[in-house]
Amino acid sequence: VVRLNDWEYRNKIALPFAYKSKSGRVSLGFYEKKTHTVVPMKWCPLHGEWAATLIQDVTEWANNEKISVYEETSGKGLLRHVVARKLDTLTVTLVVNGSRVPKLEVLARKLEEDFGTVTIFVSENVKNTNVIFGDGAKLVWGREQKQNLGTFEAVVSPLSFLQVNDEVRDAIYDKVCAFLSDFDGDIVELYSGVGLLTAQIAKRLENAKITAVEIMPDATKNANALMQSLH
């Protein structure tokens, strides 16, 4: 695959919440290497400006509305992670140590002001674990939107896998389809996520039979909807 953009290529970001050590204000950032110490950040060169705006909106909301942050040592506090994917529209998932997020409408309105159409999910994770998401994600604001994924449009749920680099994804899929261009047998795609590669192959190789295999319920639901749209 040819080398493409080195910067601002990621369509997804996942950031833990933390309190700043000196000011005590809520921040978002990445973990320091081999620690659970969060290094606050306002911008990341691997993401577009959308991520900087998201970080500002979410941290200002948490600070202004005095929303508590989860602390591993005590097991108390609400906000654990924010996970966001920016395709045609913005999808945000708040991972929380509880079931209810106060003042959610305030955050939603601010995000809509900056991003237009916004979809928000809440994932409850009350376990003492390094895993980001809980067992699922509940839609709490807006509705799931079809996203332009190159050749196809599809809904991508927050727990579904999708390549984080759109350009590299398209380049890889083109090469795979070219490699299989004369193949007319059975093809199995394992860990298929939302089924985007499966759909590409099915469209281009009319004589081949392809089966997608995926265990995540949300991704399977997205993939089935995408396959139905091909008929």
Spans of features found by a protein language model:
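Extended interfacial segments that mediate partner engagement and assembly in macromolecular machines
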Residues: V1-E71, L87, V101
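Residue-level signature of catalytic and energy-coupling elements of molecular machines
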Residues: I13, V82, N165
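A short glycine-rich, hydrophobically flanked beta-strand micro-motif that places a catalytic Asp/Glu
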Residues: Y70-A84
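Short, aliphatic-rich beta-strand segments
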Residues: A84-N97, E153-S157
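Nucleotide donor/acceptor-binding cores
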Residues: N11, L90, D184-G185
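Short beta-strand-initiation
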Residues: E8-K12, R25, G77-L79, V140-E144
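Feature of Fe-S/electron-transfer and energy-metabolism proteins
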Residues: L4-R10, L79-H81, V188, V194
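Rossmann-like S-adenosyl-L-methionine
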Residues: R100-H231
